[in-house]
Amino acid sequence: MGETLAQKIICAHLLHGDMTPGSEIALRIDQTLTQDATGTMAYLEFETMGIPRVRTELSVAYVDHNTLQSGFENADDHRYLQTVAKKHGVWFSRPGNGICHQVQLERFGKPGRTLIGSDSHTPTGGGIGMLAFGAGGMDVAVAMGGGAYYITMPKMFKVNLTGTLRPYVTAKDISLELLRILSVKGGVGAIIEWGGPGIAALSVPERATITNMGTELGATTSIFPSDDVTRAFLAAEGREADFIPLASDPDAQYDRVIDIDLNTLQPMIACPHSPDNVVPVETLAGTKVDQVCIGSCTNSSLFDMLKVAALLKGRTIAPGVSLSISPGSKQVLTMLADCGALTDILASGARLLECACGPCIGMGFSPNSGGVSLRTFNRNFLGRSGTKDAQVYLVSPETAVAAALTGTITDPQTLGPMPAVTLPEHFRIDDSAVLPPAPADEADAVEVLRGPNIQPFPQSRPFADTLTAELVLKVGDNITTDHIMPAGAKILPYRSNIPKLSEFCFTVCDPTFPARARAAGDGIIVGGSNYGQGSSREHAALVPMYLGIRCVVAKSFARIHAANLINAGILPLTFENPADYDALQPGARLRIDGIRAGMAAGKLTLTDTAAGKAYSVVCSLTERQQAILLAGGLLNYTKEHAL
């Protein structure tokens, strides 16, 4: 039996384990990336390991999230990242150089390599044929130190594309259509491979849009073959030597195959407040729009921006609409300026923002109260934009432009003929904003600079054999890491300061949570299905750990968050009978006995001591994960088992 493309790359990087779906495997990692919102903690963790220099082929530290610098905290973090990167063998992408996934794709991504990043949209690299995973910062720190990256061997899904996209129908619409089919939970435990005759007409930026939004499906990662399209992109970036052809075997077997006919696809839109709440754009035509944002790691490539400029040329945005443009990288912005496209964008009335994440994470450009905002982003969770009552929709750049021009949600196919847009054969190459690390023989002399907001990494506690704790919070289904640890301009500056950050934990759900969790001493959280979906931010585990949370019991967990809980020393458990969720109420005193033996057996008993009721919970942990929890988290475990 033949192998899928993902199986081939996994096999080439397999250090331990059996490639049977559901079993734990350990992978050798070639490249890592961090961004500044999660990177400061990742490098603090790396420093505690005492390893002088990274052991990957390539590691890059990006600054693209906390770029407002409204106080000293962001600037101090950037200075810390620049100096710690220089000292330990990491390349540093300066603020303004671009969004990590866009720059990584342009300048560093290589087909067939493995990549993990402390950002959940790291699978963007699958657009160039990489096996790329989002992960918590602790896992990235271990990989930088030469350690393996552990995952559960995924199932293999295949999406076959046939036909050709019609004008105004885009890669974003393909992503939204798959979300409509599968939901935000439909890709959990799977790698999604894209193939079929329809992929031949998709450029690397379009493919990267699709693999980027595989994260919203809950997929482990997504990947395209490396083919002539890939070669052309690498050649345009002056990196054709990095090209290798990669494809699945003709007789490869998949656990599920999904067919999408591009000929019948139409412009799609994800309605508030979930990326899978998808309908055709035409069904919402006429809805008033207040704001349009074009950019993010999903839709900020040169190809996207050239299409936006072509549609805006000679036109003016509607008086009641505010339009922002965030190019994905300095390369994109410079080339837009070179060809005159930037002038067309600005002449339309658009506002040019920095080459950064910006509005996607609530870092500026928040909508008006109750406003309707159309965004080319990948998430529209409640409050993520920075405005709690805003209605955020996810669309393609073409649909975004149509709304900006008309002032209402509009099917872009009504705009007339789509202007022809082609990518140049060669892109402008300027890597001056990517700073190299110090040579190994000069690294000792580099001083790592730390501002007063950068606090030491919090210490977790090993597990005793019995846990007695208060149920301090009960939440529902699809709780995101934005619910657990909000982002935005007011909170992100404290990502290096866990004590300060803890003041905001779960306040979206319950403003009293931080104080009650501290008062409880040891605490337990109960959640519904898909607990912890969304961003890979490990702060959504580290901060609850700091507040005394020892265990989370849920109907099911998102993959990255479950790993982050274990890394932080928090025990993730699932209900054997999901109906037991309804019986547990906040304030209950809960006890778990025989933790060590129960971990090994895969089942524990959760007892409500006042009610005298016992509930069976499942403990799906590998031996390694059990050892991590018993040690009090991954850093303690790593120190005990030197890399």
PLM regions: where:
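Fe-S-dependent hydro-lyases/dehydratases of central metabolism
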Residues: 1-643
